[in-house]
Amino acid sequence: MHPSDQTIFALATGPLPSAIAILRVSGSRAGDVLRALTGSLPPPRRAVRCDLRSRDGDLIDDGVALWFPTPASATGEDVAELHIHGSRAVAAALIKTLSAFEGVRPAEPGEFTRRGFENGKLDLTEAEGLDDLIHADTDAQRRQALRQLGGVLGDRARQWRDQIIEALALVEAGIDFSDEGDVADELMGPARAKIAELSAEIAEVLAEQGRGEKLRDGMVVAIAGPPNVGKSTLINRLARREVAIVSPHAGTTRDVIEIQLDLDGYPVTVIDTAGLRDSDDPVEQEGVRRARLRAAAADLVLWLSTATDASDPDVKGPEVWRVRNKIDLANGEVAESGPSQPVFRISAATGEGFADLLRELTRFAAQYFGSAEAGLITRDRHRRLLADAAASLTRSLVPGLAEEIVAEELRASAHSLGRLLGRVDVEDVLGEIFGRFCIGK
């Protein structure tokens, strides 16, 4: 029996013990399993309290069963849900009983969603939206994932693909009537107009500057500077807990420390880097090398120095802010800054000035992400396939191109959109996408 023909089961809820746990069963034998466990099938889509018993008749638990017959289920197959007490012993006994049924096996990660995809319950962009929703850390990410799960990109891609196929039909009809010049011209004119319109629409989406990808991946802020200027104290204050060792000895931080922040719904990763200085210690040298690499790759660098240090930042990046720390120890002596050099003066130890820095970080994050929720593209896969589709459309509009070549370019464009939706030739990416899901999803 092929694995896709087998009935699968998995725990669909979080770690045990818990108040309740849910086991999900999907496949052709789901009804047989449910009937064997409870004695009968409950009415479809109604929660029914029941005794769950082993095949020997021993009581496993007093639980709740739900029955979703095909095709009206999340996977498109027969699906049963068993709501039990969230005990490790209860779950283990039920899993042992399920494993004893012939043709029934534990599910692989993401296998329930993959079966839903294969049975037409959702397209590949919607499955990716579900994955993003599961992994969302902030409210903005949650909203974007829900839009993707709701089909915001998939619906547009389907519309574009349908219109390309309509234009292709006109082009092929023109080829069939190529001996009758007027008829062929009358068909090719509307086809080219439609192609130009579609090409402009997709180009507009591609010009969104990666807003959706930015929100999915988050913004990176690096804290950099010389040793002993309070970088670890600042990241601890941002994290509101101790994540880095604070020490008066230079070179304490040798590796990069990361924290995840939710700044007004925006996902931000803050990294604390090793103090930048010359050192004979090979371990510290490696830490400094990594610090420079991470700072250069960050979206924003907070260059930390003492309150009296007016030296220029020793890092490069798209955006570098000067942060003068330890103003509580400066005795009123704070270095000045030039007119084009805004400076934040703080005490990471006492919190003085920290609210102003945090407010500007939040403002910068909002500006960085922009109206990300209006973006359609959330993954590199989306951008690559849309770019391929747009390139084929552009090539099809080259003046004087033979109608047969135009038709071939339109087929290639429709094929790229089909790959985006998961309709054609995507077996190579399915394992990667669904493998990120939890077991039981």
Swiss-Prot record:
Q: Mind telling me which Pfam families this protein's record contains?
A: MMR_HSR1, MnmE_helical, TrmE_N
**Keyword field contains Nucleotide-binding:** yes
Q: Which residues bind Mg(2+)?
A: 232, 253
Q: Which GO terms describe its cellular component?
A: cytoplasm
State how the cofactor is bound. Answer: Binds 1 potassium ion per subunit.
Location within or outside the cell: Cytoplasm
Q: What is its main location?
A: cytoplasm
* Cofactor(s) in the UniProt record: K(+)
What's the Enzyme Commission number for this chain?
3.6.-.-
- List of residues binding GTP: 228-233, 247-253, 272-275
Q: Name one GO biological process term.
A: tRNA methylation
- Subunit field text: Homodimer. Heterotetramer of two MnmE and two MnmG subunits.
Q: Which family does it belong to?
A: Belongs to the TRAFAC class TrmE-Era-EngA-EngB-Septin-like GTPase superfamily. TrmE GTPase family.
- What is this protein's record name? tRNA modification GTPase MnmE
What is the originating organism of this protein? Rhodopseudomonas palustris (strain TIE-1)
Q: What is the lineage of its organism?
A: Bacteria, Pseudomonadati, Pseudomonadota, Alphaproteobacteria, Hyphomicrobiales
